[in-house]
Design a protein with these regions (language model features):
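Short glycine-aspartate micro-motif
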Residues: 80-86, 138-140, 201-206, 214
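Hydrophobic "anchor" residues
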Residues: 103-106, 152, 223-224
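Glycine-rich phosphate-binding loop and adjoining helix at the ATP-binding site
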Residues: 107-194, 200, 288-299
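Short glycine-rich anion-binding loops that position phosphate/pyrophosphate groups of nucleotides
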Residues: 144-146, 210-211, 283-284
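Glycine/GP-enriched mid-protein hinge/lid loop-to-helix segment characteristic of carbohydrate kinases
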Residues: 177-269
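Short, ordered coil/turn segments that flank beta-strands lining enzyme active or ligand-binding pockets
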Residues: 99-103, 148, 219-220
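Short, acidic Gly/Pro/Ser/Thr-rich loop/turn segments
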Residues: 88-90, 146-148, 212-214
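ATP-binding/phosphotransfer module of carbohydrate and carboxylate kinases, centering on a glycine-rich
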Residues: 1-57, 62-66, 70-107, 114-128, ...
Length: 331
């Protein structure tokens, strides 16, 4: 049962969602966008203004008549820390930190390369970022492995395997909320939001040289994680080769790599029947994409074939977008 405080929080977040679009808004326009009464918007906007989350200013519209209060987000009020733990195709460990405003403006970017990237180094970098930006209100962490109840497993970075990463980061987060998940889940969520989907099913197939290929899916607006984050780990399907062999085969491309990618795509189509299958990473290029489309079209009746699309720029733009969208939901 939803109590009064829950309703109030939902109403507040509905107003925030409008404000996060940027620009200036009146109580009347926010009421129209949210379906809330003008009186409710007035009460909640006054609170947001007192807290410093929004700025309010009185204007005379068209220079005549009574003045009207106009509100916009205060970008200095809070920020979002996005931390990506990554491994490039040469095996270098990367720690990428981005600080975003609630309007998605990039306030700070940093990339650090490591020979060894363990839990202490990740925690140390987050501590450093919190000292530099004390208005950080939430922390998003993306990993190159699944998060099983706070423990990093199947990590592409060996020294982070079985790391109790969530507990370690909560220690340094100083009460700030943390959301942590497999990198591909952020990518697919960012792509889903970018496409404007709400009820559709989108699957991302991520193929990167020197790491195990995998998938991530969003169904009806919800990320599919499974019992402990293993959902989408197609590299553990019985392809007749080890995970190490799969990595080598996919890195080589055609013909064996293409065959494995097609099998993976067909398994996703058969199990999830998605509206769209998005290919990302640095293995599938436009030529290979055409071959994948041809092979899938031969195997699947046209009425069941999803839209097959190759992401621009390896799909990297969706990673940060997925983190930003998750941060908005954490309010």
């Amino acid at each position: 049962m939803i109590d009064t405080s829950d309703v109030r929080k939902m109403n507040m977040n509905a107003i925030r969602a409008v404000m996060w679009r940027g620009g200036e808004h009146t109580k009347q326009s926010i009421a129209a966008d949210t379906g809330l009464s003008v009186a409710t918007c007035n009460t909640l906007l006054n609170e947001l203004e007192r807290n410093g989350e929004v700025h309010g200013q009185k204007y005379q519209l068209n220079g005549v008549g009574r003045s009207t209060s106009v509100y916009q987000i205060n970008e200095d009020y809070e920020s979002i820390l996005c931390v990506r733990i990554d491994l490039d195709s040469e095996g270098n460990r990367l720690l990428l930190c981005d600080v975003l405003s609630m309007l998605r403006s990039t306030l700070y970017q940093e990339q650090t390369q490591f020979t060894i990237l363990d839990m202490d180094r990740v925690a140390g970098k987050i501590t450093e970022m919190l000292e530099k930006f004390p208005n950080i209100s939430c922390i998003l962490v993306g990993t190159s492995g699944i998060i099983d109840h706070g423990v990093l497993r199947l990590s592409d970075i060996p020294e982070l395997e079985e790391a109790h990463l969530l507990d370690a980061l909560r220690t340094v987060a100083q009460q700030r909320p943390i959301y942590m998940t497999y990198d591909c889940q952020y990518r697919v969520y960012g792509a889903y939001k970018d496409a404007g989907y709400t009820s559709e099913t989108l699957t991302l197939l991520f193929c990167m040289r020197n790491v195990l290929a995998g998938t991530a899916s969003v169904i009806g607006g919800r990320i599919v994680s499974g019992k402990n984050g293993f959902a989408g780990m197609t590299g553990y399907m019985p392809w007749g080769m080890s995970q190490e062999e799969q990595i080598q085969v996919i890195a080589q491309g055609s013909p064996k790599g293409l065959e494995l990618i097609v099998k993976t795509a067909l398994s996703v189509i058969a199990v999830l029947n998605p509206d769209e299958l998005l290919f990302a990473g640095n293995v599938v290029d436009r030529e290979m994409m055409e071959a994948v489309q041809t092979a899938c079209a031969k195997a699947v009746p046209p009425e069941f074939l999803p839209k097959l699309r190759l992401a621009d720029h390896r799909g990297d733009q969706y990673y940060l977008e997925g983190m930003y969208q998750k941060a908005l939901e954490m309010k």
